[in-house]
């Protein structure tokens, strides 16, 4: 139990100790036996006044709740400890649980199961990170695309090649546990207190490796290059999963297959697993010089060694549709993220230092199921494929279509680059970046860029770059589950994470993975 002193606003260049001193001053708790620590810090660059905003935890040897009530200060509150209750069932599990997919959701599901003695079997269609790095690098240098091992598939999932953002809006108490587990396996210790924590692809990969080793150390098994090909269901209940040409008997399987496992979606649907279409988004990647974003958001303080590379979050709604920035990568690169042949797909990635020349983010436009309804659950998948194939046809290769913002706004193709150089690793073809998108998405992007330029000075500058398409922001389907977390149509299957339509980002996927593990643990003994 603790006292929380929130909203402590100080000049950005003061050390953390100044926030602790201010918390002590505000509460009058200056005695040496009062322990204090910063538990949250963020940067506020609004209105041209750059501040760090702190929350400080104070642990006192008396009734902290009564003290907070007596103070009657809105910025001082009592925070009881949140105890996570680990469930333990009594039924006997005949076969070890199976976890399909080793992205954030599957990784955390398997980790929790292994740490509590359930010896999970993990099936991952891609390779381990060592192999994956080699395969991805070879593709980016002009080699063949491996449709089972790429940016989307393999150990760590799509999140392993991202900015490693750990922000979420779900407010689940398990979020703290996720951060603690990541920090215990090599993530920077400060992720537990930053309001916008990130790890970076370089560090995150090592964290994933360490967690996988811990799974194996605790009795789990991980099989790479082993895609799920189907499930066996008897009387509405799971009895086996199919992989590697064999039936693997199991009563419980966590399906954390990722948002790009389109062939697996189709196979599971054919086995009777229920799917429904859901909203998602499509768009392009936008790149600016990071120094220009810093100047726009930090003003004269841009470049100060105590300020991180600036990041942003933009959104606009009009005519029942949204356009928003997504997965912003300060000092990052645009990456080739396709998982099917003869397609072009972009995504964003950055390293922990975020010290690249460009800033990039997706500019995504919302897509509603009514935009693509074809009478099946997979109309959104079909739309994604049409966009990705159209981009490939446009360039004639895995190179991505690219266009300056000024040319896009003026409705003309780009012939020559300006100050911003594209970072897409395979190379780009200058022309029209958004021509592969539906008309409504092109219109929304064209109308939103000037609006965003009024929010961040220079955002719609003529030399900024658009590279497309961005189609994998989230899953276009949901593997619908009931209150018991089982998938409709098959008791024993637990759809999980982004691919199931129940998460968006590393943190929420990891939390969903833990919840899936708890669902098994509350029913069965280890």
Predicted feature descriptions by range:
Residues 1-52, 56-185, 189-526:
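Residues forming the flavin
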């Amino acid at each position: 139990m603790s006292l929380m002193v929130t909203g402590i606003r100080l000049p950005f260049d003061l050390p953390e100790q100044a926030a602790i001193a201010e918390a002590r001053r505000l509460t009058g708790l200056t005695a040496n036996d009062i322990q204090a620590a910063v538990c949250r810090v963020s940067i506020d660059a609004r209105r041209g006044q750059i501040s760090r905003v702190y929350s400080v935890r104070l642990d006192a040897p008396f009734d902290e709740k009564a003290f907070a009530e007596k103070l009657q200060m809105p910025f001082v509150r009592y925070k009881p400890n949140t105890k996570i209750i680990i469930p333990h069932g009594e039924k006997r599990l005949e076969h070890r649980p199976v976890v399909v997919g080793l992205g954030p959701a599957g990784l955390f599901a398997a980790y929790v199961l292994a740490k509590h003695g359930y010896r999970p079997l993990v099936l991952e269609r891609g390779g381990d990170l060592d192999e994956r790095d080699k395969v991805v690098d070879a593709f980016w240098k002009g080699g063949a695309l491996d449709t089972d091992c790429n940016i989307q598939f393999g150990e760590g999932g799509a999140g392993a090649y991202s900015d490693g953002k750990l922000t979420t809006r779900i407010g689940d108490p398990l979020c703290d546990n996720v951060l603690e587990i990541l920090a215990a396996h090599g993530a920077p210790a400060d992720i537990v207190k930053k309001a916008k924590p990130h790890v970076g692809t370089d560090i995150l990969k090592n964290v994933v490796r360490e967690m996988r080793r811990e799974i194996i150390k605790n009795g789990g098994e991980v099989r790479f290059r082993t895609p799920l090909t189907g499930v066996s269901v008897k009387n509405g209940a799971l009895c086996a999963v199919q992989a590697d040409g064999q039936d693997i008997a199991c009563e419980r399987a966590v399906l954390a297959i990722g948002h790009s496992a389109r062939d697996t979606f189709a196979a599971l649907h054919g086995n009777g697993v229920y799917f429904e279409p859901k909203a998602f988004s499509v768009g392009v990647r936008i790149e600016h010089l990071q120094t220009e974003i810093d100047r726009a958001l930090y003003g004269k303080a841009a470049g100060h060694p105590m300020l991180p590379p600036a990041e942003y979050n933009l959104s606009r709604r009009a005519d029942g549709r949204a356009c928003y920035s997504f997965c912003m990568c300060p000092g990052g690169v645009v990456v080739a993220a396709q998982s099917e042949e003869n397609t072009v797909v972009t995504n964003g990635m950055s390293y922990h230092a975020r010290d690249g020349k460009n800033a990039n983010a997706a500019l995504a436009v919302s897509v509603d199921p009514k935009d693509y309804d074809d009478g099946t659950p997979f109309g959104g998948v079909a739309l994604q494929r049409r966009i990705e194939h159209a981009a490939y046809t446009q360039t004639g290769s895995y190179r991505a279509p690219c266009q300056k913002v000024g040319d896009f706004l003026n409705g003309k193709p780009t012939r020559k680059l300006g100050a911003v150089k594209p970072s897409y690793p395979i190379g780009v073809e200058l022309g029209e970046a958004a021509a592969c998108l539906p008309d409504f998405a092109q219109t929304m992007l064209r109308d939103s860029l000037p609006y965003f330029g009024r929010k961040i000075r220079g955002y719609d500058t003529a030399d900024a770059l658009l590279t497309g398409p961005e189609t994998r922001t989230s899953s276009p389907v949901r593997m619908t589950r009931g209150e018991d977390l089982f998938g409709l149509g098959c008791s024993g299957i637990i759809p999980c994470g982004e691919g199931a339509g129940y998460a968006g980002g590393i943190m929420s996927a990891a939390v969903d993975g833990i919840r899936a593990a708890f669902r098994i643990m509350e029913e069965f003994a280890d």
